[in-house]
A protein has these predicted regions:
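Secretory targeting signals
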Residues: 1-2
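C-terminal segment of N-terminal export signals and the immediately downstream linker at the start
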Residues: 22-54, 60, 364
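Flavin (FAD/FMN)-binding glycine-rich loop and adjacent Rossmann-like elements that form
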Residues: 46-47, 90, 102-103, 119, ...
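Beta1/beta-strand and adjacent pyrophosphate-binding region of the FAD-binding site
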Residues: 50-61, 402-413
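Loop/turn elements at helix/coil->beta-strand transitions in domains of secreted/extracellular proteins
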Residues: 53, 74-77, 136-138, 312, ...
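N-terminal export signals
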Residues: 6-28
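Conserved N-terminal/central alpha/beta ligand/cofactor-binding core
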Residues: 44, 70, 76-77, 81-155, ...
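N-terminal Rossmann-fold NAD(P) dinucleotide-binding loop
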Residues: 64, 416
Length: 786
């Protein structure tokens, strides 16, 4: 976007040069002065430093852990940053549990991971890798993306900046091992690499339980030698090899390929599949010395092929190393890569032993004449007072604009999936962004696949009927009883509904900030496995479940802490193929605190030892709640308060899992354990106070913590998501903000489909009680204040 001031500067400079007869120079000057709309300006800021170490390892693959542990054993201080909610993203994420013929277990870690002839379970892999880090004093975080790098005054690596649900933090170091699949950290440092060439790319994808499929893009469908056995059940495992075009080196292109592959392979018998595509990128870095041979042993593989040519102290432990692509396909499989990782960890540790951590470091920023779309807001608070190591400067720079959409939904969970589908069905150009590799959130990947309470009419009734209709009534996986849904069926139904409606879907993306101009939210800042960027929106739906983006934009919020330590119980349950309900309540966790989340996953693996696997998302019932234009109270629920702008209808008991704090409950605790209350939620509770162009849904809505249990049931939030998606699309069509939209028009549609009772069309605003009415009420109180 070019401003009036920019326009005047450009035309003045170009005119001056043209008047001197230099038309070529005039064109060049104008081109360099015109802001690039493909980039968004970002202002200067300071990033909190949480650690200072010798080595940072970026990536959570088995080879990354091997390198980190090997370096730690030499005495190096190591910090590992993994972007998935588990370690072993190559084995567990891409489903590479088998050993190929000739793959020898040459390291102690390899022998621990693959102890016998049978395929190891995901939980065994994850816990073994985690224990290796803990036992060797390697610090690590889950669910964190490397988004920027630190450099010293000479341009050498001096650390990384990471993004997670706690915000962004910096880690200072001497050197970096980039163990990401696409050498994304090397890219952030400006490491030279071969040019990208568009064309056909080979991708591998593994499914469990399905019958083999045929499609023009499938060049091989191999049934692996061992099925997956859980109890008395046995499931075949099929690995597909696809040839598909990769249009460019953007994350959007990879996301598109992923959805095509999922389209071609899914059926109703599927009980599991890869989170991540396995492939060997055609691009490599330019290394100190390319290797073109075929070593007789992995030990003969020269480390120079893994070291950047133009960036000192940068190593690439991944398939983008400068080795032949056929060789990369062999050595990046888990067993050989464990050996390579161990070699690299030892080599790097020796080379940096006597090098000091750079005394000065700043965030490396893109040098682009970026457009001024607005300001980027984010959380920049230290994780803990005890971890505060100062700050590093992040000068003004630029973020790539990854796309522009009518409606962007950040979070594809219980409400977010419905919101995206609804907006797309109304014709809005819609993008849904989800951190995990499936839709539905806690209702699917969180293994809470059975309804408790909730209003099951309206759009939810459509979901329920449609999901169960995906298979014949006599299918062995059809659940017995109402309100139960196989997790993978529901995930797939959401996914296909969104895509068939014309929506776009990117998995593996985390929201880490907001783009704002004044009070207007204009987009979301995201972290992807390829780096950080901005996605522009006309309407942004914050379905993170904890108002992450609204808070980053400056919205006030409420949560446990200063006022009270009360928090509802949570869990981190087991999972095995075919499961859809493993609810539990055994821990307390703040799922917006990355240290607490990482701790919960560590603790869960010990508790669940011997199980097949565990969930990929903490099963939390209480999160940050935005302060909206209105805050629903316990009194509103008990008194059945009505509103003229009701957007969703809810039915539940006070299903609290922990201490209640509202003073009303001291006088008069909730009645019977399972008394059902009906509650309306007005649109005002989904509108962050002081912000335009954004709505929050679900557990992030504006409500008192003791009122939230009545309005957080899955059936109700599916309906709420649909309503918000419909409203957002209408805002785009009519070019109005959510506060200016004709709410009665929205309500009429929601009444028609059964989301809302017809009375909402005539409900009036409650004006409250006068002082005289309150005095009369107090005087008439009897029967223990009831």
């Amino acid at each position: 976007m070019i401003t009036r001031r920019d326009f005047l500067k450009v035309t003045a400079a170009g005119g001056a040069l043209a008047s001197l007869g230099s038309v070529t120079e005039a064109k060049a000057a104008m081109k360099s002065a015109v802001p690039d709309e493909g980039f968004c300006h970002e202002g200067a800021r300071k990033i909190p430093v949480i650690a200072e170490v010798d080595l940072v390892v970026a990536g959570g693959s088995s080879r990354a852990i091997a390198a980190a542990v090997a370096a730690a054993k030499t005495g190096s201080r190591v910090y590992l940053v993994g972007y998935m909610p588990y370690l072993g993203e190559d084995i567990c994420g891409s489903h590479l549990y088998e050993r190929k013929e000739g793959e020898k277990l040459q390291t102690a870690l390899a022998r621990k991971l693959f102890p016998g002839k049978n395929f190891p379970t995901p939980l065994h892999i994850k816990k073994t890798l985690e224990d290796e880090l803990i036992d060797n004093n390697v610090q690590f975080l889950y669910s964190s993306y490397v988004t920027n790098v630190l450099t010293d005054p000479s341009g050498k690596p001096a650390g990384v900046v990471i993004a997670n649900r706690s915000g962004r933090q910096a880690i200072r170091c001497k050197t970096i091992i980039d163990a990401t699949h696409n050498a994304s950290v090397a890219g952030l440092l400006g490491a030279e690499r071969k040019p990208f060439i568009a064309g056909s790319q080979e991708f591998c994808y593994t499914v469990v339980g399905n019958t083999p499929k045929e499609a023009p893009e499938i060049i091989q469908a191999e049934e692996l030698s061992q099925p997956i056995k859980v109890g008395e059940k046995s499931y075949p495992v099929t690995r597909y090899t696809f040839h598909l075009p990769l249009k460019d080196d953007s994350y959007a292109s990879l996301a598109e390929v992923e959805q095509i592959i999922r389209n071609r392979t899914w059926d109703i018998d599927q009980v599991d599949s890869s989170d991540l595509l396995w492939y060997i990128p055609k691009q490599t870095i330019n290394s100190e010395k390319a290797y073109n041979g075929n070593p007789v042993s992995w030990r003969k593989l020269p480390m120079q092929a893994f070291k950047s040519k133009n960036i000192a102290n940068l190593w690439v432990l991944g398939p983008c190393a400068e080795i032949p692509r056929e060789l990369a396909a062999k050595v990046m499989r888990p067993v050989p890569a464990l050996f390579i990782g161990e070699m690299m960890g030892e080599t790097v540790a020796r080379q940096i032993k006597d090098i000091p951590v750079p005394a000065q470091a700043t965030v490396r920023q893109l040098k682009v004449n970026a457009s001024n779309y607005g300001q980027t807001g984010e959380l920049l608070s230290p994780l803990r007072p005890s971890l505060q190591k100062g700050f590093v400067a992040s000068p003004a720079g630029a973020l790539p604009v990854l796309g522009s959409y009518d409606v962007v939904v950040m979070g594809g969970g219980t409400a977010g999936a419905s919101a995206g589908i609804s907006a797309a069905k109304q014709g809005a150009n819609t993008l849904v962004l989800e951190y995990l590799h499936g839709l539905g959130g806690l209702s699917t990947l969180g293994m809470i696949g059975v309804y408790w309470d909730g209003f099951r009419g309206g759009y939810t009734a459509h979901i329920d009927k449609s999901v169960l209709a995906m298979a014949p009534k006599d299918h062995p996986r059809q659940p017995k009883g109402e309100g139960r849904f196989p997790a993978d069926w529901k995930m797939e139904w959401h996914r296909k509904e969104l895509l068939q409606a014309g929506g776009k879907l990117w998995f593996g993306v985390m929201g880490c900030g907001a783009l704002i101009e004044g009070s207007q939210v204009k987009g979301v800042v995201v972290a992807t496995p390829f780096g950080r960027g901005v996605i522009l929106s006309k309407i942004l739906i914050d379905s993170t479940g904890s108002a992450d983006i609204a808070i980053a934009a400056g919205a006030a919020f409420d949560y446990t802490g200063k006022k009270t330590i009360a928090v509802q119980g949570a869990g981190t349950g087991k999972w095995a193929p075919g499961d859809y309900y493993n609810n539990n309540d055994w821990l307390f966790v703040d799922d917006t605190d990355i240290l607490d989340v990482s701790r919960a996953f560590v603790q869960a693996k010990t508790k669940l030892q011997g199980q097949y696997d565990l969930v990929k998302i903490p099963q939390t019932r209480e999160r940050r709640r935005v302060i909206g234009d209105y805050i629903i109270s316990v009194y509103d629920v008990i008194n059945h308060r009505r509103y003229p702008d009701t957007i969703s209808y809810h039915k539940s008991s006070f299903d609290t899992h922990g201490m209640i704090i509202d003073p009303l409950f001291i006088l008069n605790p909730p009645e019977k354990r399972h008394k059902i209350y009906d509650a309306d939620v007005p649109l005002r509770c989904l509108l962050p106070k002081g912000l335009e162009g954004i709505l929050t849904t679900g557990l992030g809505a504006s409500a008192h913590r003791d009122a939230m249990p009545v309005i957080r049931m899955q059936p109700c939030l599916q309906n709420q998501g649909y309503a918000v998606g419909y409203l957002s699309a209408l805002c785009v069509k009519e070019n109005k903000s959510p506060r200016k939209i004709d709410i009665k028009k929205v309500q009429r549609h929601l009444v028609k489909i059964g989301n809302l009772p017809e009375r909402v069309l005539t409900d009036k605003e409650f004006k409250g009680f006068s002082n005289s009415e309150m005095k009369k009420a107090i005087a008439s109180v009897t029967d223990n204040y009831k």
